[in-house]
């Protein structure tokens, strides 16, 4: 996706990598996140990148109607980017609809969402247990699942598990996975159905590398189809 001169919204900007990379590529960037603590993380990343101006950011939930109205009043975006975040909101389908609603006609919606797998409900219980457990039990769960996740990833991908693409070491990757809750998931066909009903077409799709990983989508916003009543007039 060519970002030069485009308006770019990053949903769940976190430490700000996508936000700052988009700025480097010439986009006019904005970011939203539900956690105000990520402003400090973004500031640290900005210093590493050597970016002089702090990107425009807002703190709020993609599920908050008042917050969405505030964003929409300022206009929709050429590119809306929501990478691996909407499945942690507690209402993934609504979050997808809300995020897609911020895209201009002809604009691009980029998202990554956890894939549905037979083991997904099991992981949901594990993640909920981790969240509700004292620190000692959390550490024990990481010790138990570290070799399980290590072996599964090695078998499925054929790659060394410590060679990650996420910018964190494998141990913290395991902590992030086991502790990532709320946790929702959907098959690729489900996501395509949700988004295409909103007058989008899918330009690119990449299946999850591991069964419970993220399916990756690039959609383009189409012009709304005329209703039958309008076409008769």
What are these regions (language model features)?
Residues 6-12, 108-139:
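Conserved class I S-adenosyl-L-methionine
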Residues 17, 21-64:
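Class I SAM-dependent methyltransferase SAM/SAH-binding core
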Residues 1-5:
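Conserved alpha-helix/loop element of class I SAM-dependent methyltransferases that forms part
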Residues 81:
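A conserved beta-strand element that flanks and buttresses the S-adenosyl-L-methionine
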Residues 182-198:
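Short alpha-helix
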């Amino acid at each position: 996706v060519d970002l030069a001169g485009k308006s770019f919204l990053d949903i769940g900007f976190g430490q700000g990598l996508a936000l700052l990379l988009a700025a480097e590529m010439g986009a006019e960037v904005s970011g939203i996140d539900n956690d105000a603590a990520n402003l400090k993380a973004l500031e640290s990343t900005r210093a590493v990148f050597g970016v002089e101006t702090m990107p425009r950011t807002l703190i709020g939930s993609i599920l908050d109607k008042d917050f969405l109205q505030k964003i929409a009043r300022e206009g929709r975006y050429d590119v809306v980017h929501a990478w691996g975040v909407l499945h942690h909101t507690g209402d993934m389908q609504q979050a997808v609809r809300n995020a897609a609603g911020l895209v201009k006609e002809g604009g691009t919606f980029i998202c990554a969402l956890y894939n549905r797998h037979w083991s997904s409900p099991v992981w949901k219980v594990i993640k909920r247990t981790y969240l509700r457990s004292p620190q000692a039990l959390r550490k024990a769960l990481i010790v138990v699942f570290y070799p399980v996740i290590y072996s599964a990833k090695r078998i499925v991908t054929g790659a060394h598990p410590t060679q990650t693409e996420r910018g964190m070491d494998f141990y913290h990757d395991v902590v992030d996975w086991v502790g990532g809750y709320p946790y929702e998931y959907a098959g690729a066909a489900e996501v395509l159905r949700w988004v295409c009903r909103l007058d989008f077409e899918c330009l690119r799709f990449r299946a999850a590398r591991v069964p419970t990983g993220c399916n990756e989508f690039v959609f383009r916003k189409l012009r709304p189809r005329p209703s039958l009543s309008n076409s008769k007039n």
